[in-house]
Amino acid sequence: MTDDTWGLLRKRLLKTVGQNNFTTWIEPLELDQVDGGVATFHVPTNFMGNYVSQNFADLILHEFNKSGEAVQRLAFKVAANSPTRPVQPTMSEAIEEPAPLQTTVVDQLGNQEGNTSVKSPPEDLQAAPLDPRFTFDSFVVGKPNELAHAAARRVAEGGPVTFNPLVLYGGVGLGKTHLMHAIAWELKERNPELNVLYLSAEQFMYRFVQALRERKMMDFKHLFRSVDVLMVDDVQFIAGKDSTQEEFFHTFNALVDQNKQIIISADRAPGEIKDLEDRVKSRLQCGLVVDLHPTDYELRLGILQTKVQQNRKNYPDLKIADGVLELLAHRISTNVRVLEGALTRLFAFASLVGREIDMDLTQDCLADVLRASERKITVEEIQRKVSEYYNIRMSDIIGPKRLRSYARPRQVAMYLCKQLTSRSLPEIGRRFGGRDHTTVMHGVRRIEELKTIDGQIAEDVEMLRRSLEA
């Protein structure tokens, strides 16, 4: 096998595993030789060889065979001056009597009981681990996520299946994975015998590819169709992967026909996932589809207050000055993970230097985070987006006309300017045809009132906010 052939394989692997995984795990591999059906690689460490063997061997073998290379297993050895100790190879030969597979939540959490008699592919299915921090008790509920939280609670009660599937979608760091883990924990607590399988869509694809290669599709089908609850995270990963979507579709149908619960998460609504087959979209949309909206100020502040109480266990003597949490909730608005990470950094830094967490320390410690989180949305951008959304001219928003069809979008634009920019009310008024600050204040308050009683206005504002912050 030539280096050029391995180079082509690497390019295909890059497309499959993504840039981060490729850079970390595939790029360091140095092909030594292909001989007797064994592809041998040099790796920097035994750990890397073992990790690649467990997580990427299926894909690498698949690509070898697609290229016409009769590779049946991979071997890894550490490049060193001393004699190298080969890493345990990954076998591709079919095993006649594979070991039983543990598929319940109890097994995934490290408990040794509950083995099923389901036969598996040669390697046990590595279900995604559950984070013990992600429970319903630790989930902070606010208006942006209250519906998703209520739906997750209902499913976790484990009674009759009322909506199937439950699809949770939203941007990064809004709580999808937290709710997925919380559901699994609650189901486990209520019924330890329940057969719950939680995994990522990426893991589903890897197991599918392995089953195809080893001609173990019946085992694969039996495994996934014998669960009581199937939970698949980040379903958008299978978009564009036709064979995987085909099997996912049939698995989905089989479980629904058995009245088994399915819970899915995605980074956007099913109908908006590019390259996802229409029939899969249709299936996902036939249950309850719930959006986790971007956090508002009150929810972010509540999350910070909860995290402070949790951090008190490790930092009982630290003090936080008034206004610090409010500053963070106001300035870090797009990603809860960044928000929580900022607070963790603050606690660690203050503890190391022995200082109170005040405004000065916050500005010094989090200068990069606060700078990156500064709002860069302009008044003009908001005016343009709002006029496009309501299909009116930008001059009508700025102009003097007081028709309802112009006045309401104008008030929405003023409200968004107040929320998403640092402009003062008089400055905003000047950008809206020279209006004074009292007019802007009235418009802002009017939209705040309407959001609570008019679902359409609330949806309009949220859609525009997400569009502007994207």
Swiss-Prot record:
Q: Which UniProt keywords apply?
A: ATP-binding, Cytoplasm, DNA replication, DNA-binding, Lipid-binding, Nucleotide-binding
UniProt region (Domain III, AAA+ region), positions on chain: 129-350
**Segments of this protein annotated with the region Domain IV, binds dsDNA:** 351-470
Biological process (GO), any one: DNA replication initiation
Can you say where in the cell this protein is located?
Cytoplasm
GO CC term (a single one): cytoplasm
* GO molecular function per UniProt: ATP binding; ATP hydrolysis activity; DNA replication origin binding; lipid binding
Q: What is this protein called?
A: Chromosomal replication initiator protein DnaA
Species name: Ruegeria sp. (strain TM1040) (Silicibacter sp.)
